[in-house]
């Protein structure tokens, strides 16, 4: 009898484990099925060259940036500069750019759904509309003029990213060889989307963070004046400006982007206050942009000398911020309770209907409301 009881208990445990495992599999299947089916080894969706062979990528105006021919070969826009300007948004042929739509939104382009999988009796794949305007990307890429960097423009009221450019870039129809990528400095970081995944010294944009802290922590701020001679002694070194700004109040110091004044303010506010306001500004956070995580910024204020803190206060020293985070910080909505987070996937057109891309939950309304006028 005891043997029967033990065997029954063992059977119940095995049945429970089976149910638990099945439930876990079903949950993961529902959650990750689209990502599984869009794996590059799936020859139903990828051609022999490893290129996604279904779906079209279009900009906000309906200009087709990438599509596939009947034989499954992938094609790109017919202007080489536009191809370079939209490279990090659309993606390259081999899927080396992880932030490109051909990789990041492969499940949406494939037309995958729980009912029929990736098979569609009414067509091959979906049309994916981005919020980007290819013309804006073209203009921004031309303005970079071969320099390394990133350009981002968005509608802060809706969160739509209108322009997202990263350089250096290359023509996806004529990609550089592996040797060129390694040996030619012009292609350094070409696979990196600097707007989403890069960090840079914020420079003078960071002065707005210092100013916000000073407005709230220094009651006499708008009564103060400073005289800039082009070099201000802070601690054991000088904080320099490109030229002398003369006598200034806080408004003219901001307009002149005076390093000396903001270095002095940073020293007076101190490390802890600067760190608090930097965190509140979201510059150390990672944003989720259409399902992609941006790089988090880094600011180290611990144990700095007075001169180092002064340079940190003007966005130099060891300060690093993500371009997307800076863009979101500088574009708060003044009317909404929640500021929409940026996104660049607009909608996808399926054989059955046109559906919006999954929404972003948004981020809390910025604590920074701009610079109030002097009392």
What are these regions (language model features)?
Residues 61, 157-204, 209-375:
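Beta-lactam-recognizing serine transpeptidase/beta-lactamase-like catalytic domain environment
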Residues 1-179, 190, 199, 224, ...:
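Periplasmic/cell-envelope proteins involved in peptidoglycan metabolism and beta-lactam response
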């Amino acid at each position: 009898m005891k043997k029967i009881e033990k065997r029954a208990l063992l059977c119940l445990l095995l049945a429970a484990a089976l149910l638990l495992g099945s439930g876990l599999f079903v949950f993961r299947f529902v959650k990750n099925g689209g990502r599984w089916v869009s794996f590059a080894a799936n020859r139903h969706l990828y051609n022999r060259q490893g290129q996604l062979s279904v779906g079209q990528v279009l900009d906000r105006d309906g200009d087709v940036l990438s599509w596939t021919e009947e034989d499954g070969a992938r094609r790109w826009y017919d202007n080489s500069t536009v191809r370079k300007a939209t490279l990090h948004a659309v993606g390259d042929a081999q899927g080396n750019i992880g932030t490109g739509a051909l990789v990041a939104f492969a499940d949406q382009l494939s037309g995958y759904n729980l009912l029929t999988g990736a098979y569609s009796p009414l067509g091959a794949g979906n049309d994916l509309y981005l919020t980007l305007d290819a013309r804006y990307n073209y203009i921004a890429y031309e303005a970079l003029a071969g320099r390394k960097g990133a350009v981002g423009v968005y509608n802060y009221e809706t969160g739509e990213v209108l322009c997202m450019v990263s350089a250096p870039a290359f023509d996806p129809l004529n990609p550089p060889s592996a040797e060129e990528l390694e040996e030619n400095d012009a292609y350094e970081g070409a696979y990196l989307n600097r707007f989403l995944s890069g960090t840079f010294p914020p420079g003078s944009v960071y002065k707005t963070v210092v100013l916000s802290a000073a407005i709230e922590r220094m009651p006499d701020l708008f009564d103060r004046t400073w005289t800039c001679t082009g070099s201000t002694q802070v601690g054991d070194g000088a904080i320099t400006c490109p030229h002398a700004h003369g006598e200034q109040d806080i408004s003219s110091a901001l307009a002149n982007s005076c390093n000396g004044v903001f270095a002095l303010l940073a020293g007076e506010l101190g490390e802890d206050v600067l760190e608090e306001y930097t965190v509140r500004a979201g510059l150390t956070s990672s944003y989720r942009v259409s399902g992609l995580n941006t790089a988090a910024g880094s600011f180290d204020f611990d144990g700095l000398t007075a001169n180092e803190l002064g340079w940190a206060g003007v966005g130099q020293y060891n300060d690093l911020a993500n371009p997307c985070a800076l863009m979101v910080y500088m574009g708060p909505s003044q009317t909404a309770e929640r500021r929409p987070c940026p996104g660049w996937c607009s909608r996808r057109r399926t054989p059955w209907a046109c559906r919006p891309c999954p929404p972003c939950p948004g981020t809390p309304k910025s604590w920074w409301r701009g610079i109030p006028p002097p009392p």
